[in-house]
Regions:
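STAS-like cytosolic regulatory interaction modules
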Residues: 1-49, 59-91
């Protein structure tokens, strides 16, 4: 997994998202949401993902909403879209 910041401030995730990446990803997302009212994630570069990674995204999104902040997904790769559809996870 690689995380970069686009020119517009969105976080671009690239590569594979697996359970081994969950803690690092959680730290990055929570850290960004502590200093901003909105966080945009670009998942178009994600090649593979597991349900643990998607569950983390759903959890962070719910936490953000509870704190009256927004976690927005700007785009989903076909792989992420398929896993969301198969598991019923709403992103």
């Amino acid at each position: 997994m690689a995380i970069s910041v686009r020119d517009d401030g969105a976080l671009h995730l690239q590569g594979d998202l697996h359970i081994s990446d969950v803690e690092e990803l959680r730290t990055v997302l929570i850290g960004r949401l502590e200093t901003a009212s909105e966080l945009v994630l670009d998942l178009s570069g994600v090649d593979r993902c597991d349900t643990a990674s998607l569950q983390l995204l759903c959890s962070v999104k719910k936490s953000a909403e509870r704190d009256r902040k927004q976690l927005c997904i700007s785009s989903l790769s076909p792989v992420v879209r398929e896993v969301c559809t198969m598991t019923g996870l709403p992103l």
